[in-house]
Amino acid sequence: MWRGLAGVFPLPTDSCNVEAGPRVSQHPRLAPRQQSPPDAIARSFAHSGSAFLCASFASGARYRYYEWSGIEQGLSVKYDTFRREYTAGGLTREGLDACPIRQVEIWLEQAVRADLIDPTGMVLATVDEGGEPRQRIVLLKGLSDAGFVFYTNHDSDKAHAIECEPRVSLLFPWNVLERQIIVGGTAEKMSDAESADYFMTRPRESQIAAWASRQSRPIADRAMLEQQAEDIRLQFGDGDIPTPAFWGGYRVVPQRIEFWQGGAHRLHDRFVYRKCAQGTWNIEQLQP
């Protein structure tokens, strides 16, 4: 059996092929839970078809693929039995910075040092004109006292939702570190100049993708998308690719930022910063 962070997953040894690398074994184990979060590297468990991607919880490990021929047979999973204790450490009022943005930066730095996969990935929640909530992951591309920055197609579903209801929520779900950050605020469209400055830093293929994709619109198949990208390559040749008029950034101006740290026996630590009329921040501790 392979014991993960959230439960137990069967890993048949007779159908498991392991790529060569340091600390390779048929039964990879987690490092001791007493490791401090910044030093304990994330253990990932993802699958694509019959391939499972595992990363060692110890520093310096390489990613390895496990082929599991029995995955097609399906699993009998008892979801109500998935549980674990949170032991990474507590969070105190004295340990928090007076500025929530600075505290976000501290936790982001620790998430990066822990080699988490996509530490800047954040769940963006919106509500459309019909009141339907939607969530998706976007990447944090800027952080300052002014707010949290991400970029997208202005004709996407998320952009239309923001136009109707600019109040949004962001979530940084760092499960391995037993941490969450929840941000509530208002999304504002950034200037064309700011968006262009960032667009110029993107890899060329990412620039092409921004032009090629009519984000959130139906498409016949993958081949059609690839052809649209090829058409853009031919259109611009070897020249510079300008910023599309339909693409740009949003800045989420925070009014509320909550920090959550998992605690033993589900007695978690929660602190919320709320912005006052004077521009200062008030800090409160919340019950879990």
Where are these regions (language model features)?
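Extreme N-terminal basic, low-complexity initiation segments
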Residues: W2-D14
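Basic polycationic patches enriched in arginine
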Residues: R3, R23, R29, R33, ...
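Short polybasic linear motifs
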Residues: A6, G21, P37
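Intrinsic-disorder-associated, low-complexity terminal segments enriched in Asp/Asn/His/Tyr and depleted
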Residues: D14, H27, D39, H47, ...
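Cationic, low-complexity basic patches in intrinsically disordered or flexible, solvent-exposed regions
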Residues: H27, Q35-S36, W68, Q73
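Binding-site signature for planar aromatic cofactors or substrates
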Residues: E67-P288
